[in-house]
Each structure stands twice: as structure tokens, then as C-alpha cells.
Amino acid sequence: MNRTGLFIALGLFLVIGLLFGLYPELDLKLAAAFYDAAEKSFPLKFNAIAAFARDAAMWIAWAFVVPSFAALIWKAIRPDRPLLVKGRTIVFLLATLTLSAGVLTNLTFKSYWGRPRPVVVIQFDGPEAFVPWWDPRGTCGRNCSFFSGEGATAFWTYAPAALAPPQWRPLAYAAATVFGAATSGLRMAFGGHFFTDVAIAGLVSFLVIWLAYAMIYRWPRTRLSDERIDAALTRLFWPLYRAKQRRRGREIGPAPSA
């Protein structure tokens, strides 16, 4: 998560945004590579193995955050015990996944950016008009094409890659890139998204992760520590824990000071 990665991501954002903004037909040409005009469908979406691979990709991505989520739940139950996972790891993984694959994707753009999916546009024998990535005035009402939630989730694996040991980090970043690209390619092959939907999803995820990593691990003014996070969670969950112990006839004092 260095400045080189940031500059590459911003450069790609600029190039892809301008190129596909000026020549939106490129999105249609890339989508057409997966379309069978004779069958009037995107045939790969009916392939059982491809469908399983799509589901498995999401299971793999979510598996990276399960330990952090479980550790947070256990901390809520037993705030008197130390966190089982590093505090910064929990905050970093949960915050980046929530923002990139949740808030920015499904709760914001996909709900209000009315771009129809490839499978329903006129060029692929659907009823709706194609619109370029930058135009929110499409006829899609909900769960729209821009930008891809599954693409954002797949590329979110940059977050656990950023926490890999330094000697393994380049390989982890490469694996996250391949994983995100393969998952995004499947979404395109199913007619679920255009190239710009998945590419921008990946870039948004990367930028969210880069900023969160800098705030949590690097910048002195915002940098957190595992101990501070553990102490803050103890204070947060202590009142409920104390009330539960009182119901069991056990009197305990206030939360331990940091």
C-alpha cells in the first residue's frame, strides 16, 4: 500500500474513465465476446461449473473476514478477555469490506445509478437502452450494473494481502489481482456487468483499502494501535457484560482503564 500503487490506480482510473467515456461502444464490444447471437443469451451463465466458481469466489473472499468478525463477537460476549485477533486487523478488514463492497456499491451506486446490465440491453436482445458508465440516467430501477458488487468484493482481497508478511506481500497482491480479475471476468461472461463496472469496482476497492491502510497503520495523526482498539472495545461492551453478570448474581466493577 505505497504511493506507487496509488498512482497506478489513479492512472488506470483516468485512462479507463476517459477511454470508455469517449468510446462507450468499447463496453459493448467486450460484452459481445461472451454473447451468443444465435442463442440470444450469455451461455456461460447456464454452466454449472462456472456458477459454482462464482459462488466459491465470494466464499473465499468472505472467509478472509470471518476470523475478525468472530473475534469481535467473542469480544462482545467476553470483554474481559483480550481480542483473539489484532485490533487493527479487525478494524481494517471489516471497515474496508463494509465500505467498498457494501456502502459504496450496494447502498449507493447500484441503488441509484440506473445503468442496465448487459443481459437486458437492446444490443443483446433485451428491452433497455445501453448507457455509458458515467451516465446515471438509465432505466434500471434497482440492483443496477454500475458498479459491480462481486467485483468490489473480489478485489477487496487486496486488504488481507496488505497484511501479509512483507516478503510474501508482492505475491499476495498478485494473487488478489488475479482473483479479482477472474471473478470479474465471470461476471462479464454471465452478462451481469460491463467491463467498466468491474474495473471501476476494483479501483474503488483499492482506493478505499489504500486510504484505510494509511489512516490505520501509517499516518501518525490517525494511526491506531491494537491495544487502544482492544481497550475501546472493552469499554464499549462492558456495560452489557456487567449487566449480564449482575443478573447471575455476580457483582463486577467498571471497565478496566486503558
Feature-to-residue mapping (PLM):
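N-terminal transmembrane-helix/juxtamembrane module of multi-pass inner/ER membrane proteins
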Residues: 2-69, 110-113, 117, 127, ...
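Membrane-embedded catalytic cores of phosphoryl/pyrophosphoryl-handling enzymes
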Residues: 2-13, 130-255
